[in-house]
Amino acid sequence: MPSLLISVLFLHIAIYIINTIAASTIDSLLWLIYMKLPTSASCIAREQHQMKLEVVQLKREMNATSSQDEFAKWAKLRRRHDKALEEYEVKNKQFSRFKSFFDVAVKALRWAGTSGLIVFLQFWFSKTPIFTLPPSWIPWQVEWVLSFPRAPMGTVSIQVWGGACAVVVALIGEAIGATVRYLYASKDSMEAIKVGAGAVEKEKKRQ
């Protein structure tokens, strides 16, 4: 089944990209989008922001008021500040709990759409061969391993093919990442050498 073969390969590529590069970006983007919607969480976030501004403003007024010369005013500001700070901390804990719940839900949905889909495909197509090997091409023991757990002998199962795809994609991803890091490091080194050479040249001209 070429379509299943290609689907599993591209699904593993997508999983690697999402989990290695874009997971935090996707989570942050979904959170920003959710905060734009008229939900209870967005209301809590706005209230939290307003409370934070109020606490900061009262703190500034307290610092600008002398506790000795204007004790009555300072004490009143202190009480307002302490009350506002307490309310802000309660609201902040409420917001943090909701954010934690949102993060767990997003991670669960991401897993269901990537790794969970792989698990489903492996279960649903466990008896379906990805491709067939040439007859007597390899020992029967190896054929049994390649067809594990339920594919016909002489074929490659979706479990084995998926595992091979995951390993190869990870190796290629690591190689690309190492190459990119090396190129950036070389570029920074060349720029540092140019800057150093320019400084030496200017020093020679001054002399």
UniProtKB/Swiss-Prot annotation:
It is found in: Endoplasmic reticulum membrane. It comes from the Eukaryota. It is a multi-pass membrane protein. Residues 44-97 form a coiled coil. Gene3D superfamilies: Helix hairpin bin (1.10.287.660). Residues 1-4, 132-155 are lumenal. Keywords: Coiled coil, Endoplasmic reticulum, Membrane, Transmembrane, Transmembrane helix, Transport. GO terms for biological process: tail-anchored membrane protein insertion into ER membrane. The chain crosses the membrane at residues 5-24, 111-131, 156-172. GO terms for cellular component: endoplasmic reticulum membrane; GET complex. Residues 25-110, 173-207 are cytoplasmic. Required for the post-translational delivery of tail-anchored (TA) proteins to the endoplasmic reticulum. Acts as a membrane receptor for soluble GET3, which recognizes and selectively binds the transmembrane domain of TA proteins in the cytosol. Interacts with GET3. Belongs to the WRB/GET1 family. This is Protein GET1. It comes from Paracoccidioides brasiliensis (strain Pb18).
